[in-house]
């Protein structure tokens, strides 16, 4: 789901816990650790991103000005959404420029678990219904990708005015011998010939357990000077 990434260049939900092994490692274990990992748990990583409590800040410099976005993900339990019982998580995105708060946005992601299926997203002026076109794999090979979701965004729950339609694609690329970048790429608004918001790519560095090790957001959008990209990452 697109969360608040376009509105606030945020909306990531990261698991704060990273499991680490300690102690001695025998020779067989050491040999195994040097082998490149080629498969990663996509579903577990996405559950950590969207359904687990978290609090994190990403940073960027836009036209020489320091910008930071803090986002907090708060699981809220079970609710009714679009006629079905689902799980939901609230996302609060707070944007600061030069350390001064300029915007605070609240959105809610809706999904079901076991298996993970995305259902939609709401904010003050959006009511979004997701149609998942492909299942989320338990495991995937590095280099894999899938366009898995189409989302229709309405101005309110009455669904009388369709204001946005976009697709989402996940991709998995190698980051190191034992980690990978899982990116969620949102298309432009398919209802517009030229979308001023452009595209958003939310990327998460994951390990073999699906823990979130790092994150970043890239927002590419058209301007008078051509395509521009704003990059947000951990400080």
Give residue spans per PLM region.
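An acidic-aromatic
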Residues: 98-131
């Amino acid at each position: 789901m697109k969360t608040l990434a376009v509105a606030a260049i945020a909306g990531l939900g990261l698991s704060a816990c990273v499991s680490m092994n300690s102690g001695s490692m025998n020779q067989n274990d050491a040999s195994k650790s040097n082998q490149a990992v080629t498969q990663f748990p996509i579903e577990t990583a996405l559950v950590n991103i969207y359904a687990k409590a978290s609090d994190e800040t990403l940073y960027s410099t836009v036209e020489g000005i320091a910008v930071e976005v803090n986002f907090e993900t708060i699981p809220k339990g079970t609710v009714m959404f679009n006629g079905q019982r689902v799980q939901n998580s609230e996302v609060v995105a707070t944007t600061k420029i030069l350390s001064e708060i300029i915007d605070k946005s609240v959105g809610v992601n809706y999904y079901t678990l076991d298996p993970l299926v995305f259902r939609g997203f709401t904010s003050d002026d959006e009511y979004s219904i997701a149609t998942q076109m492909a299942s989320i794999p338990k495991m995937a090979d590095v280099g894999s990708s899938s366009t898995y979701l189409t989302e229709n965004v309405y101005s309110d729950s009455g669904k009388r005015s369709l204001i946005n339609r976009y697709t989402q694609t996940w991709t998995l690329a190698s980051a190191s011998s034992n980690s990978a970048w899982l990116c969620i790429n949102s298309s432009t608004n398919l209802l517009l010939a030229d979308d001023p918001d452009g595209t958003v790519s939310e990327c998460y560095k994951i390990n073999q357990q699906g823990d979130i090790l790092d994150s970043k957001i890239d927002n590419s959008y058209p301007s008078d000077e051509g395509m521009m990209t704003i990059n947000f990452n951990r400080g």
